[in-house]
């Protein structure tokens, strides 16, 4: 699968603490290998999935037709669902 990042995701990744970066990278690699791994979201985020890299959430979508995984954002639980 091709991995793409939104501008928001790239911006958020730059603000994550150094101790959380390895966890997030591992989760993103696992998403790339198996995009259906995450939990489907509801409401305004319907069509997207989340994967927890505690204490962060990786919000992403994937298109099986184009074989693309799009990392939408990475943020802490209290903030990620407000965007």
Question: Which residues does each predicted region cover?
Answer:
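Short, well-structured alpha-helical segments
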Residues: 21, 25-29
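Generic N-terminal leader/processing signal
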Residues: 10, 25, 46-48
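Enriched for short, Lys/Arg-rich terminal
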Residues: 2-7, 11-22, 53-56, 61-83
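A short, surface-exposed loop/turn module that caps and links secondary-structure elements
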Residues: 29-52
């Amino acid at each position: 699968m091709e991995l793409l990042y939104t501008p928001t995701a790239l911006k958020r990744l730059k603000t994550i603490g150094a101790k959380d970066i390895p966890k997030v990278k591992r989760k993103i690699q696992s998403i790339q290998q198996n995009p259906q791994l995450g939990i489907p979201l509801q409401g305004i985020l319907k069509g997207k999935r989340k994967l927890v890299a505690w204490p962060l959430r990786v919000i992403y979508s994937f298109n099986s037709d184009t074989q693309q995984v799009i990392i939408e954002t990475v943020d802490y639980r209290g903030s990620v669902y407000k965007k």
